[in-house]
Design a protein with these regions (language model features):
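A glycine-rich phosphate/pyrophosphate-binding beta-strand-loop-alpha-helix module
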Residues: 101-105, 109-121
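Active-site beta-strand->loop segment that positions catalytic residues and contacts the acyl thioester
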Residues: 51, 67
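Redox-cofactor-proximal catalytic regions of oxidoreductases
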Residues: 76-104
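Domain-length cofactor-binding catalytic modules of enzymes
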Residues: 2-45, 55-61, 69-73, 81-89, ...
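Acidic active-site catalytic centers that drive phospho-/nucleotidyl reactions
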Residues: 63-64, 95
């Protein structure tokens, strides 16, 4: 992307002033190198978002931004319903509530050293993964509705976790306002056999070593030490979330026309928040969030069982679970006025700072854990939300590395077996269902996650706490 079109506010903040139909400016947080590497389509999509009714402050893009459907991935936009604000299915994405949860194992790298292969094999057997993968659960439609209403609370009630898990999950494991009746039967049927599955693409379960600590005091609060082993699970709402997105994108095209909304791009199909369609989508999307929370909770149960088989007595405790494809109602300041806003985060992680009431009590003095996944074979990070992030981008931060090339392009550069062998040579065990999928997710198909995290830290979006190195990766 050409940088000359932006006003450089600081080393890490780039602004494109509002012009034409834009109601607010575009603000991108990135180093100059990351900004230049972004596709021009990111700027175009961020500008289009800035034209939507009721948008507040700016159309934001995170350091890992790349172009997506309608909104850029890594985009953040907040809307005031009382100023004609809209909700957009494209602003949430197809994988509703895709997110990461990280578990502390109580084990160290030295303690698991001789059991890496048995652990990798046991996790591969225990965790259903891959395109169209099915789990060991089959939910009736009435049971599906209960899950969509209760989220991870349903899973815990069914014996797949503990109250402590809920306490350390975003929304305490249950998104209020879910309306299963707004989810199509087709979406529900797609999910009946998919609970407790990873799926494919960039989703994974990864056993990781805490390789480096950047902030000892917060790491101590989070219960992290160098050499510790943690497990991170990255997945979302599977087929149900995708179907909700598909269903409502079609409906919103019609709704936008009916409400006289002039859209700069059809992919930005949206509906006024104060409309029947806006309300219906929010109810369905919240049900999708609950599906993802329940799915990650069941995967946690399966992970605990697998660890217990190899390491009897292992006690895996949840650090945090946070999503990065959502639209949430939150209170934020806009020009000194406290407003109730609908914050779209698409490929962006909520990052509440110290003292925020939504942060679990155990972590409140430190700020919310912000879990950042790298690409396969590269490091991941644990960050903490900051107080200044609220004023920067509505308490939002990055979500991962961000793609540097398409999956199709990646297939022309790498073969799956080659990637698996290369990573094995570095001591990283890969267990996968598809060699094609491994090639599509090759490490160099993504941006440098360390550069992305450094930019987020330097800009004040979130604070670096710990660096995680992969040991075992289970992929679809």
């Amino acid at each position: 992307m050409e940088t000359a079109q932006f006003v450089r506010k600081s080393e890490w903040e780039w602004t494109l002033p509002a012009s034409g139909e834009m109601k607010v400016p575009v603000v991108i947080y990135a180093s100059e190198e990351l900004l230049r590497a972004m596709d021009e389509k990111v700027r175009e999509q961020a500008v289009n978002v800035a034209m939507l009714p009721g948008i507040q402050r700016a159309s934001f893009a995170m350091p890992d931004a790349h172009w997506g459907y309608g909104f850029p991935i890594g985009g953040v936009a907040a809307f005031d319903a009382d100023e004609g604000g809209v909700v957009s299915a494209g602003g949430v994405g197809f994988d509703i509530s895709c997110g990461v949860r990280t578990l502390r194992t109580g084990l160290t790298r030295n303690e698991i050293g001789l059991a890496l292969k048995p652990l990798a094999d046991e996790l591969s057997r225990a965790i259903p993964a891959g395109v169209g993968s099915t789990g060991r659960l089959h939910l009736s439609l009435p049971e599906m509705d209960r899950m969509l209403t209760m989220g991870a609370r349903w899973a815990v009630k069914e014996g797949y976790g503990t109250e402590s898990d809920l306490e350390h999950s975003e929304e305490r494991g249950c998104m209020d306002g879910a309306e299963p009746d707004q989810v199509s039967e087709q979406a529900k049927r797609r999910q009946q056999d998919e609970m407790g599955t990873l799926g494919s693409g960039n989703h994974y379960l990864e056993v990781q070593e805490v390789k480096e600590i950047f902030d000892e005091s917060i790491a101590r609060i989070y219960g992290l030490r160098q050499g510790d082993i943690v497990v991170s699970i990255h997945c979302g709402s599977r087929g149900l979330g995708h179907q909700i997105g598909t269903d409502f994108l079609k409906k919103m095209v019609i709704a936008a026309s009916r409400h006289g909304l002039v859209l700069p791009e059809r992919e930005l199909a949206c509906a006024p928040i104060h409309s029947a369609m806006g309300s219906q989508y929010l109810g369905a999307m919240r049900a999708g969030i609950n599906c993802a929370l329940a799915n990650r909770q069941i995967l946690t149960y399966l992970t605990r069982k697998a660890f217990g088989t190899v390491f009897p007595g292992a006690d895996l405790t949840l650090l945090y679970d946070v999503s990065h494809n959502t639209c949430k109602v939150e209170e934020h300041f806009v020009e000194g006025e406290r407003k109730r806003l609908y914050v779209h985060r698409k490929g962006a992680t909520r990052a509440f700072g110290p003292g925020h009431p939504e942060v679990p009590l155990a972590w409140r003095e430190a700020g919310q854990p912000v879990l950042i996944g790298g690409s396969m074979g590269t490091c991941s990070y644990i960050l903490a939300g900051t107080l200044e992030s609220e004023g920067l981008a509505f308490s939002s931060a990055v979500h991962g590395a961000g793609r540097a090339m398409s999956r199709h392009q990646a297939l022309h550069h790498w073969q799956g077996r080659q990637v698996v062998n290369d990573l094995a040579g570095r001591g990283i065990l890969i267990r996968c269902r598809s060699m094609r999928g491994v090639a599509e997710e090759a490490p160099f198909a993504y941006k440098d996650v360390s550069a992305v995290v450094d930019a987020a830290d330097a800009a004040g979006l979130a604070r670096k706490i710990a660096k995680l190195a992969p040991v075992i990766c289970v992929k679809g």
